[in-house]
Amino acid sequence: MTINQISVFLENKPGQLAEFTRLLEEKQIDMRALSIAETQNFGILRLITDDPYKTVNVVKEAGYVCSVTPVLAVALSDKPGSLVKLLTALGEGNINVEYTYAFIARKKDLAYMVFQVDNPEKAMQIL
């Protein structure tokens, strides 16, 4: 399934992530997944929420720079070898995984992963 990921630029200094997540709490936005890629001066927060459109509006109104990217959300059996099977299938289909991170779920026996790939349509066919 394709979902919308929000990428937000945060200053790389103490308290910035707490301030940002407090904003989401105040606006009753529930985070489902997050990942941070950092550089010396700023971080890129990749975020999945329960309402991406509301999130973008709230984030922009608060003065943050953000963008929206479609990514794949994939459910895997929560057992050894599930991820390697998926990655092997993508590799054999010549799909490059640009990054991935875990997704918080409430279903038993399943693990969810978010994938940014170079060809989402083809990846969906493979999966």
Specify the residue positions occupied by each region the protein language model found:
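A conserved regulatory-domain signal marking ACT and ACT-like small-molecule sensing domains
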Residues: 1-127
